[in-house]
């Protein structure tokens, strides 16, 4: 199969196949704290490790418009810290709850009934009982060009 971004419907595919082609994809459950001390927790399917020396991870924030910032990105850019929580099977339902579009400042930990655990080296809490949590310091935000067809 030859894949051309945003031309999937012309090929008879109901959805863009990129997410299915690059698999399995881990879910990065990103916890962040805003400069107003509000806590945010949201899952990101475009998350991965970039390097082990230096240790670096990334998550991709996709928005409807260039002017709209997701709470996670806003918080990470304001405070420079975030936690990547690795989602286990026991957290699937809570992760789905945290993916809802809550107003800025609403704490998804509370909505999803999750335990907040203090991190060791940063001010952002992590999710209790996840298989792993990566305490991170923001290095750089890259703004990628948007596809003219909306992707």
Feature annotation, model-predicted:
Residues 1-40, 48-151:
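Active-site-proximal mixed secondary-structure blocks
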């Amino acid at each position: 199969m030859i894949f051309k971004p945003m031309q999937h419907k012309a090929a008879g595919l109901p959805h863009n196949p990129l997410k299915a082609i690059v698999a399995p994809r881990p879910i990065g459950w990103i916890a962040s704290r805003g400069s107003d001390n509000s806590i945010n927790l949201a899952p990101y399917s475009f998350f991965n490790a970039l390097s082990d020396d230096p240790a670096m991870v990334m998550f991709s924030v996709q928005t409807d418009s260039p002017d709209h910032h997701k709470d996670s990105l806003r918080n990470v850019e304001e405070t420079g810290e975030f936690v990547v929580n690795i989602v286990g099977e026991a957290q699937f339902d809570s992760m789905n709850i945290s993916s809802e579009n809550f107003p800025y400042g609403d704490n998804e930990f509370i909505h999803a009934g999750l335990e907040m655990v203090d991190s060791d080296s940063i001010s952002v809490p992590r999710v209790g009982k996840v298989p792993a949590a990566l305490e991170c310091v923001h290095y750089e935000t890259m703004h990628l060009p948007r596809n003219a067809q909306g992707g």
